[in-house]
Design a protein with these regions (language model features):
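Glycine- and acidic-residue-biased ligand/ion/polar-headgroup-sensing regions
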Residues: 59-71
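A short, N-terminal "cap"/entry segment at the start of jelly-roll beta-barrel domains
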Residues: 1-38, 123-131
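Short beta-strand His + acidic residue motifs that chelate non-heme Fe in jelly-roll/DSBH
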Residues: 73-74, 90, 96-102
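Short acidic-glycine-tyrosine-enriched beta hairpin
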Residues: 77-92
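A generic "binding-loop/recognition-motif" signal
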Residues: 59, 78, 94-95, 104
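Double-stranded beta-helix
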Residues: 99-131
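Short, charged/polar surface micro-motifs in flexible loops or helix N-caps
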Residues: 33-36, 44-49, 70, 116-117
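Conserved short histidine dyad/triad with adjacent acidic residue
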Residues: 26, 40-58
C-alpha cells in the first residue's frame, strides 16, 4: 500500500447534492487521512447559518481558510468579514457560523484534527444568528 492518497475534488462526495445549494465535501475519509480532518465548502449567495443555527465543538479546534469570495463569520457575539487569503482559528467551545451575502460564491477549506466521532463532537447552537 502506498504512503499517500490522491483524489480530485470532483471525486469526493458532495453531501449537499440535491438537498442544499453549494457543496460540502469531507475530503478526510476519501483520502484515508489518519490524523487531519479537511473539508471543502462552496457557498453560493445567501447560504450558511445566518438566520438560524451555529455550532461549537467538544474537542475539535477548527481553522477556516477562505479560498475565494468574501464571507461573514459570527464567532460568539462578534460578526466580521473574511475574504480570499484570510484564515481564522476557532477554539472548540466557541460558537460559530458562516454566511455568504455576496453575489459570488465563497469557498472555504476547514481543517481540524481527525476524531473518531465527528458528529458526536459537534454541538448545535439553535437561534445563534437571528436577525
Amino acid at each position: 500500500m502506498a504512503g499517500y492518497t490522491v483524489r480530485k475534488l470532483e471525486e469526493v462526495t458532495n453531501i449537499f447534492e440535491g438537498n442544499y445549494p453549494g457543496e460540502m465535501r469531507f475530503i478526510t475519509y476519501e483520502i484515508d487521512a489518519e490524523q487531519v480532518a479537511i473539508t471543502y465548502r462552496r457557498m453560493p449567495q445567501h447560504t450558511g447559518g445566518k438566520g438560524s443555527y451555529g455550532h461549537r465543538h467538544i474537542e475539535q479546534e477548527e481553522i477556516y481558510f477562505v479560498l475565494a469570495g468574501k464571507l461573514q463569520f459570527k464567532v460568539d457575539d462578534e460578526i466580521f468579514e473574511l475574504e480570499r487569503g484570510d484564515a481564522i482559528r476557532i477554539a472548540p467551545e466557541t460558537a460559530r457560523s458562516v454566511w455568504n451575502d455576496e453575489p459570488e460564491d465563497g469557498e472555504l477549506i476547514i481543517v481540524s484534527k481527525k476524531i473518531d466521532d465527528p458528529q458526536g463532537d459537534s454541538v448545535l447552537v439553535p437561534d445563534f444568528w437571528i436577525e
